[in-house]
Amino acid sequence: MARAKFERNKDHANIGTVGHVDHGKTTLTAAITMALAAQGGGKAKSYEDIDAAPEEKARGITINTAHVEYETENRHYAHVDCPGHADYVKNMITGAAQMDGGILVVSAADGPMPQTREHILLAKQVGVPSLVVFLNKEDQVDDEELLELVELEVRELLSEYDFPGDDIPITTGSALKAVEALVANPNIKRGEDKWVDKILALMDSVDEYMPLPERDVDKPFLMAVEDVFSITGRGTVATGRIERGRVKVGETIEIVGIRDTRSTTVTGVEMFQKTLDEGMAGDNVGVLLRGVQKDDIERGMVLAKPGSITPHTNFEAEVYVLTKEEGGRHTPFFPNYRPQFYVRTTDVTGTISAFTADDGSSAEMVMPGDRIKMTVELINPIAIEQGMRFAIREGGRTIGAGTVSKILK
């Protein structure tokens, strides 16, 4: 069977459901796909389809994620649902499925729970740009005032973690009631069922409130150097995959990381032995650099738009430590532990000086399976920025994965 072509006639965004374990994330995901399928936007998926999520490996960590897609009138969404709490945490930290926005699901019957707080905090730390809220299980609440109280609590919680709590759209409804209605009649149109309408209203709020991600090609140029060659009579070529932006022949770029930053001019861009006028995000290219010796540049450096990224050694990070079963350590580690940090294309040794738990208390040791905030100092400066993902390795095996939450130096 020929593969269907991906039609790019609508703006695309990645979205995920966030929330406490029994508040209805997966049921909501099913309700959204069914409600939009009834309007002609994609295929309906049942709870069972989504819950039996296949395992994925991201940076060596096994994560259960279900990928679902659906369309509103204006946009195409790829939706990630993680059945388990641990999967959710791992997914966010490793960026297995990068989210452009999230739907925070809170049970109107129970109000915010400890995990709700944890997810909002995590969304903030790993850089999920925007959230909208769905208060689920409205059918179980007969008191209007109780709904208002829960809404108020959720808004306060969002504001506490620097999300615009007062502005975030909150929709109430019942995912289960919507699913039941759509199972009985899979072609319910807008205005025919109050519970289905509430799901469509939620998606309207996502369409309106969630900004589209900036496309990778529009961001400032960055390419991690994977290999370096010298071509007699032409100069030095750095090869790698362009992470973002575009690079044209004749442009000035900077070589950043490990040694002092220096600038150079791009004298050629090649891909598959063909010359290009410009390379774009996603391309695997060779970039010819003027006046640079082969010894001046090495794997682990990056080529970047001048001034767009700087080298750093000290940062704070949000990290998930692999369990023994996932191939991680069998024993805990302590402050001053010195593993390798695998950033983009290279390992750099670093010292982990301190750990803190979510509540800000300092932890004495870190166990396999923990999620922790840590302070790191690398032995060499590397091009680092907030939100960047990395792996922690020891003797070539991955023992953790993290996201830079704050640059210190």
Swiss-Prot record:
Region (G1): 19-26
Gene Ontology molecular function: GTP binding; GTPase activity; translation elongation factor activity
Region annotation (G5) ranges: 174-176
EC number from the UniProt entry: 3.6.5.3
Region of interest (G2), residue spans: 60-64
Record keyword Cytoplasm present: yes
Residue span of region G3: 81-84
Gene3D superfamilies assigned to the protein according to its UniProt record, in alphabetical order: P-loop containing nucleotide triphosphate hydrolases, Translation factors
Subcellular location per the Swiss-Prot or TrEMBL entry: Cytoplasm
GO cellular-component term (any): cytosol
Catalysed reaction, written as an equation: GTP + H2O = GDP + phosphate + H(+)
Assigned keywords, A-Z: Cytoplasm, Elongation factor, GTP-binding, Hydrolase, Magnesium, Metal-binding, Nucleotide-binding, Protein biosynthesis
Binding residues annotated for GTP, in chain numbering: 19-26, 81-85, 136-139
Cross-referenced InterPro entries: EF-Tu_GTP-bd (IPR041709), EF-Tu_GTPase (IPR050055), EFTu-like_2 (IPR004161), EFTU_2 (IPR033720), G_TR_CS (IPR031157), P-loop_NTPase (IPR027417), Small_GTP-bd (IPR005225), T_Tr_GTP-bd_dom (IPR000795)
Residues in tr-type G domain copies: 10-214
HAMAP family the record matches: EF_Tu_B
Subunit structure of this chain's protein: Monomer.
Purpose of the protein: GTP hydrolase that promotes the GTP-dependent binding of aminoacyl-tRNA to the A-site of ribosomes during protein biosynthesis.
Name listed for the protein in its UniProt record: Elongation factor Tu
Organism: Picosynechococcus sp. (strain ATCC 27264 / PCC 7002 / PR-6)
